[in-house]
Each structure stands twice: as C-alpha cells, then as structure tokens.
Amino acid sequence: MGKITFYEDRDFQGRCYNCISDCPNLRVYFSRCNSIRVDSGCWMLYERPNYQGHQYFLRRGKYPDYQHWMGLSDSVQSCRIIPHTSSHKLRLYERDDYRGLMSELTDDCACVPELFRLPEIYSLHVLEGCWVLYEMPNYRGRQYLLRPGDYRRYHDWGGADAKVGSLRRVTDLY
C-alpha cells in the first residue's frame, strides 16, 4: 500500500489531500498542486484527469515544488500507485510490431541509444515489472509508465515519437 499527500502551495503549505490508491480525478480535492510528500510506494502523476497528459514518476520523498518532480506546471489531476515487483524484464525492438533488432533489458539503462546502438525504439514488450521510459538520456524529459504488456508502436505508451533515451525499473530502492 502507498500513501501520497498533495499540497496546494509550495513547501507543504495550504490545503492538502491524502491519497492511498489510484485516483482518476483529483480536481475534486484540490485545484492546483505545488508540493507533494510521498510516504510510501511509487506513484505516477498525470497532468490531466483519467491518466492523461504529461506523466511524472515519484518515489518516497519530499517534493517542495513542482520543479522537483520535473513538472511543467502546478497541474496534477490524476495519480496511480505502481505495484511493486521483484523482477524486471523488457524487450526493445528497432521497428514496430516487434520487428528488427531485439535487445533485452533487466536493469536500469541511463542511455539506451549508446548501450544498444539503436537511435529509436518503435516497439517494446514488458515481460516483468513496471518501468519508466524517459525520452532523453540520464532519466530526463517526458516520462511514460510501462506496465507489463505489449507496446506494438510508440503511440501505445503515449509517445509522440520513437525517442527512448533511458529506462528505469520501478522500485522503491533507488
């Protein structure tokens, strides 16, 4: 079980809301979010209701303003707790529909293009665990939650293009 607290103002001030499960519409509880405290679990935040828009991965810790979670604004309108798993494995493909060169990953990768010599990833298959895909190396840029399943095209994970800069396993240990 996880617990996250949203605050309307910076530095954990103003009205707050405690959440312990997925919530498709946080607008019912607050109009803006400028700081967050994650007491337990790993969470994915979304800038719009129903798990839409920019995504932000948070793990246990304090985030005194939205820049600390790489937010673009004070808009957090839905959230999802990410289940903990002990093993992680995914396969990356250079073409859509699992075609072309395939590479397997079981650990974090700070620079996908450098490690696999693939400039773009068009499809992937998450076999075990949850992952966060970042569009830029070193865990920067837009973030996308990858749950176990098939992603036949980059649109399936919400990407605007096939850029994959880095991948990180969702664990509460780093």
UniProtKB/Swiss-Prot annotation:
Q: Which family does it belong to?
A: Belongs to the beta/gamma-crystallin family.
What molecular function terms (GO) are annotated for this protein? structural constituent of eye lens
Supply the Pfam families for this chain: Crystall
Q: Which gene encodes it?
A: CRYGA
Q: Where is this region: Connecting peptide?
A: 84-87
Q: What is this protein called?
A: Gamma-crystallin A
Q: How does it assemble?
A: Monomer.
Region forming the signal peptide: none
Q: Which residues form the Beta/gamma crystallin 'Greek key' domain?
A: 2-40, 41-83, 88-128, 129-171
Q: Name one GO biological process term.
A: visual perception
> What's in the keyword line of the UniProt record?
Eye lens protein, Repeat
The record's domain comment reads: Has a two-domain beta-structure, folded into four very similar Greek key motifs.
